Every structure is written in structure tokens, then in C-alpha cells.
């Protein structure tokens, strides 16, 4: 279990600290304190269930950004086999903020693409904190075209604060790269299944999330701008980010209600970072089911299905 608790989890953190203290005492004592430990563990679980049953939108944003949340390579390691990473956009450079390559899912060849954030400072800098430059999106598009050529289903994993807004990225055509991905993904003649596993920020997320199915983990978010950015525009202060998060309706359950997301995938109690294996197994089963649904479609049906799904967004329900 993670030891990195968020502010709203402090009551849980205090209980977990007591449990850990008792465990250490028990190792050095002849007194049996197992019953007390079990009582506190049950209390901790009950408290966690209570807190997580009524999370605010801002608290969900914090969970989506949790530094110990599983990233792309954590899922690749647990869901896919024989992964072979492919590099470069064949035009400018290899952007480490987006990674992708061929792999096997249930023994069948697929293409896997996603944003990758870093764990330590060195990797965060190398991955640009999960904010892709244009060459990252062009690399992703190159891999998608390759997948289409060889008839491989495409699985994308979205986890980015947004596309990198630096001068160099803009000079090299950031907006063009994103727009081209949107247009070409809509026409791909292979199954495309997209999953938001953390942050789904703005065009940086959209550029690899045009699919036949869009899934979200329960404590992930998907929006046109960050809460801090929205608050800075509306109220001239990023301190009202919590209000912005609530107004933007960026949490998975609400987006599912609005018809933007096709499926919300449950997370382990306390969030995906509490149990990587359980989260990966749940996601694997969801991806397997969604692939079975779209895998029977012909290329023409896949394109039509994608167009219909996108056209339905924003239409009145019922």
C-alpha cells in the first residue's frame, strides 16, 4: 500500500501509521496484538470507503495526478506481452513523452501507444512531465498508420496535463500535429480503443483519444483545460481551482452520464496506486470485452462507428 497520502486522506494516514507502529512492536514483543491490528485494519478500510464514497471533483483531480499512480509502462508490463518499443517520427526527433510499440494481448498482435510521465526528476525531465511535443504526436500517428497497414488493433493510454506549449513546439506545428491526428484517427480502418488512466488534458489528450471506444478509470479526469487554467481565466486566480473542477464536470462518472465516455472502469479501494496488479487485471478484462465488441466489425463499419460515436457527443439524451 502506498505511503504517499493526499491531504484529504490524512485520517487514513494516521490509522495506517498506528497499524505500522503496532506491527513493529509485535515483532519485538511476546504480546499478541494481532486482534488489535485486525480491528484497526477494518477501521481503516471502513474509513477509506466512507471518504472515497463522496469525493469532490478536486479530490478526484488530485488522485488522477497522484505521483504513485500507475503509468503507461506499468500497464504494458502487466497487461501485454512481447512489447517492442518503436522510436521517432521520421521527421525531426523521438519524443519520450509519448511511447508506443507492438505487443501481444492475449497472444494476438496489437499496437500500444500512450503518454508516459516520469517517476524521478531525471525521468520527468526526459519525458517532459508527460507533455508531448509535435514530434510525439507524429510518432504516434506513424505507429497508427503502421498498425492500419498490418491490421493491428490500436490501444491508447491517455495521461497528460496537455500538449507542451513551448515556443519550439509551436514553431514545429503543435496545433497542426494534433489536428492531423484527430482527422486521421477518425479514418483508421482498424479497431481503436482509448483509455484515460490519469489526466486527460486538452488537445494533448484528444490527439490520441479518437477511438471506437473511450474508457476512463474511475479516478481519472478528462477536460479541455486544467482546473487551475480555467480558474485563472474565469476568476483571475488559480486558487479557485477546486471551484473550476466542479464546474467543468471533468470526472469520469459525470462524463459517462453526458455520453462522452463509453465506460467507467472501477479502481481498487483508495485508487489505482493502492494495487497495481488488481487495477491492471480489471483494465485487462475491460479491454478484452471492448475488443470483442468492436473486433467483429468490418473496416467500413469501424470508421462509421467512430464517426457516429463522435457525432453523438452533445446531442440531447432520451
Curated annotation (Swiss-Prot):
| Residues annotated as domain CoA carboxyltransferase C-terminal | 32-293
Q: Which biological pathway?
A: Lipid metabolism; malonyl-CoA biosynthesis; malonyl-CoA from acetyl-CoA: step 1/1
Instruction: For this UniProt record, give its keywords in alphabetical order, as a comma-separated list.
Output: ATP-binding, Cytoplasm, Fatty acid biosynthesis, Fatty acid metabolism, Lipid biosynthesis, Lipid metabolism, Nucleotide-binding, Transferase
Q: Catalysed reaction(s)?
A: N(6)-carboxybiotinyl-L-lysyl-[protein] + acetyl-CoA = N(6)-biotinyl-L-lysyl-[protein] + malonyl-CoA
Question: What is the first-listed, main subcellular location in coarse terms?
Answer: cytoplasm
One GO CC term, this protein: acetyl-CoA carboxylase complex
Question: From its record, what is one biological process in GO terms?
Answer: fatty acid biosynthetic process
EC assignment: the record states 2.1.3.15
Q: Which Pfam families match?
A: ACCA
- The keyword tRNA processing appears for this protein: no
Please give the InterPro entries that the UniProt record associates with this protein. Acetyl_CoA_COase_a_su, ClpP/crotonase-like_dom_sf, COA_CT_C
State its location(s).
Cytoplasm
Tell me the GO molecular function terms. acetyl-CoA carboxylase activity; ATP binding; carboxyl- or carbamoyltransferase activity
Q: Does the keyword Cytoplasm apply?
A: yes
Please tell me which top-level EC class this enzyme sits in.
transferase
Q: How does it assemble?
A: Acetyl-CoA carboxylase is a heterohexamer composed of biotin carboxyl carrier protein (AccB), biotin carboxylase (AccC) and two subunits each of ACCase subunit alpha (AccA) and ACCase subunit beta (AccD).
**Family label:** Belongs to the AccA family.
- What is this protein's function per UniProt? Component of the acetyl coenzyme A carboxylase (ACC) complex. First, biotin carboxylase catalyzes the carboxylation of biotin on its carrier protein (BCCP) and then the CO(2) group is transferred by the carboxyltransferase to acetyl-CoA to form malonyl-CoA.
What the entry lists under NCBIfam families is as follows: accA, AccA_sub, PRK05724.1
- What protein name is recorded for this chain? Acetyl-coenzyme A carboxylase carboxyl transferase subunit alpha
To which species is this protein native?
Halorhodospira halophila (strain DSM 244 / SL1)
Amino acid at each position: 500500500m502506498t505511503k504517499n497520502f493526499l491531504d484529504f486522506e490524512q485520517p487514513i494516514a494516521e490509522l495506517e501509521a498506528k497499524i505500522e507502529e503496532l506491527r513493529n512492536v509485535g515483532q519485538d514483543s511476546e504480546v499478541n496484538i494481532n486482534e488489535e491490528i485486525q480491528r484497526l485494519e477494518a477501521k481503516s478500510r471502513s474509513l477509506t470507503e466512507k471518504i472515497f464514497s463522496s469525493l469532490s471533483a478536486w479530490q478526484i483531480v488530485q488522485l488522477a495526478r497522484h505521483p504513485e499512480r500507475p503509468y503507461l509502462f506499468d500497464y504494458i508490463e502487466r497487461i501485454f506481452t512481447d512489447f517492442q518499443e518503436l522510436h521517432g517520427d521520421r521527421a525531426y526527433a523521438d519524443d519520450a513523452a509519448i511511447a508506443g510499440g507492438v505487443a501481444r494481448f492475449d497472444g494476438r498482435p496489437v499496437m500500444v501507444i500512450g503518454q508516459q510521465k516520469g517517476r524521478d526528476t531525471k525521468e520527468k525531465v526526459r519525458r517532459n512531465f508527460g507533455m508531448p511535443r509535435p514530434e510525439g504526436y507524429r510518432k504516434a500517428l506513424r505507429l497508427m498508420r503502421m498498425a492500419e497497414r498490418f491490421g493491428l488493433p490500436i490501444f491508447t493510454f491517455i495521461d497528460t496535463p496537455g500538449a507542451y506549449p513551448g515556443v519550439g513546439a509551436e514553431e514545429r506545428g503543435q496545433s497542426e500535429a494534433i489536428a492531423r491526428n484527430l482527422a486521421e484517427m477518425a479514418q483508421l480502418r482498424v479497431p481503436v480503443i482509448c483509455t484515460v488512466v490519469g489526466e486527460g488534458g486538452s488537445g494533448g489528450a484528444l490527439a490520441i483519444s479518437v477511438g471506437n471506444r473511450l474508457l476512463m478509470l474511475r479516478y481519472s479526469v478528462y477536460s479541455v483545460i486544467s482546473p487551475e487554467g480555467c480558474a485563472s481565466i474565469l476568476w483571475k486566480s488559480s486558487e479557485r481551482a477546486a471551484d473550476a473542477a466542479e464546474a467543468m464536470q471533468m470526472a469520469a462518472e459525470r462524463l459517462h452520464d453526458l455520453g462522452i465516455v463509453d465506460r467507467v472502469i472501477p479502481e481498487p479501494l483508495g485508487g489505482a496506486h493502492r494495487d497495481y496488479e488488481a487495477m491492471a487485471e480489471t483494465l485487462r478484462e475491460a479491454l478484452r470485452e471492448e475488443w470483442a465488441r468492436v473486433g467483429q466489425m468490418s473496416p467500413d463499419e469501424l470508421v462509421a462507428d467512430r464517426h457516429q460515436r463522435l457525432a453523438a457527443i452533445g446531442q440531447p439524451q432520451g
